[in-house]
UniProtKB/Swiss-Prot annotation:
Keywords, in A-Z order: Ribonucleoprotein, Ribosomal protein, RNA-binding, rRNA-binding
GO BP annotations listed: translation
Name by which UniProt lists this protein: Large ribosomal subunit protein uL22
Function: This protein binds specifically to 23S rRNA; its binding is stimulated by other ribosomal proteins, e.g. L4, L17, and L20. It is important during the early stages of 50S assembly. It makes multiple contacts with different domains of the 23S rRNA in the assembled 50S subunit and ribosome. The globular domain of the protein is located near the polypeptide exit tunnel on the outside of the subunit, while an extended beta-hairpin is found that lines the wall of the exit tunnel in the center of the 70S ribosome.
Subunit structure: Part of the 50S ribosomal subunit.
GO molecular function list: rRNA binding; structural constituent of ribosome
Organism: Sulfurimonas denitrificans (strain ATCC 33889 / DSM 1251)
Length: 105
C-alpha cells in the first residue's frame, strides 16, 4: 500500500469531498481519466495526488486501486473586506489536507 499526502492546499474541503467519494474504490487509471474531465478545481488537485500515490507504489496505474481518498479540514485563512460606513465583513478562505492511498493488485 502506498500513499500520498498534500497539505494546506487552498481548496474547499466540502467541495473536494464530493470528488474524493467518487474515485474511492476505482482503478487508479480510471480514476485519473475521470478526474481529467471533471470541471472542478479540486479534481485537478486530487488527480495530482493520485498520480503521486501511484508513483510511490512503484506500479503502473492500471495495476493500482484507490483504496482510500480522504479530505480533511485544514486551517482557515481569515481576511476582511471593507464595507460601507467604516465597517468590515469577514471572508473565510478554507484549506484542506488530501490523503490518497493506493494498493497494487
Amino acid at each position: 500500500m502506498a500513499r500520498a499526502l498534500l497539505k494546506f492546499i487552498r481548496v474547499s474541503p466540502i467541495k473536494s469531498r464530493l470528488i474524493a467519494r467518487e474515485i474511492q474504490g476505482m482503478n487508479a487509471e480510471l480514476a485519473l481519466a475521470s478526474l481529467e474531465f471533471t470541471p472542478n478545481k479540486a479534481a485537478k488537485i486530487i488527480a495530482k495526488v493520485v498520480a503521486s500515490a501511484v508513483a510511490n507504489s512503484g506500479n503502473e496505474a492500471a495495476d493500482c486501486i484507490v483504496t482510500s481518498c480522504r479530505v480533511d479540514n485544514g486551517p482557515v485563512l481569515k481576511r476582511f473586506r471593507p464595507r460601507a460606513r467604516g465597517m468590515a465583513s469577514g471572508i473565510r478562505k478554507p484549506t484542506a489536507h488530501i490523503l490518497v492511498e493506493v494498493e497494487g493488485k
